[in-house]
Amino acid sequence: RRQRQMCIRDRFVGSGGDRGYEILNGFNQAFVDTVRSNGGNNGYRHLVIAGYAADITKTCDPRFKMPEDIDNHCILSVHYYTPKTFCRASIQNYWGNKSEQEWMEHQINNLRTTFIDNGIPVIITEYGAKGSDEASRVFFCEMLTKLCRDNYISTFLWDDGSEFDRTSFTWHTPELINALKRATSGNSYVPEKPENIDEQTREAKPTSETSEHDNEPAEPEPTEEHTTTEETADIPPETFQSLTG
């Protein structure tokens, strides 16, 4: 296994940008082709396709291509951990000012227009928040879930034990589960922002220069010089087999 890992690292080191998209598109196509060629239910089972770094901005880039497959049997998977300082690092304790809400709305709308409106289902397979302010965490999760519900996107709350006690089988924050139930009820309402959020949160929001997934610089917007066509990386079968074992 170690030799195989070294092979992957050496073969694709430094391959971001256009080449990074070509590699991922090629892997995703090879995955679909491999499953479909194995008979039985594999011919039509639904397959989940990982976006670029699970990042919404990078995945909505036109260089990312969904694999060719039978109609309506591939589902896109991305994550939502924006901003990283609130969702992953526990540096920002409060969330919910106007600019932060607008950025969340922008990202979900981006998924809607790029994929949902073109017949491609989307799942946010991970989301969550680490900020210490309980009301902000609940508001973040409720607003994201409600936006996704209204735009036909399914969501999975990622829990590492901080939300649900697997010994007592109880929620640490009961209001969170109540908020998620409200958000998925199908009722028309606007999640209520906690008081004083505008004063307690920073005004900065992610921009097109900020990666949603890890706060590293995002890929530049495609230009005529590097916009790809429908072609993807050609990965020989023997290479794919060596990577997958």
Locate each region found by the language model.
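Intrinsically disordered, low-complexity segments enriched in Ser/Pro/Gly/Ala and basic residues
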Residues: 76, 207-210, 241
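Short, small-residue-biased leader/transition segments that mark boundaries at the very start
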Residues: 3-8
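Short, solvent-exposed loop/turn segments at the edges of secondary structure
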Residues: 1-2, 71
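Extracellular glycoside hydrolase catalytic/binding regions
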Residues: 10-153
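Extended hydrophobic/Leu-rich segments
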Residues: 10, 176, 180, 189, ...
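Aromatic-rich peripheral "rim/lid" segments of glycoside hydrolase catalytic domains that contact
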Residues: 134-212, 217-219
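Long, low-complexity, intrinsically disordered segments
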Residues: 216-245
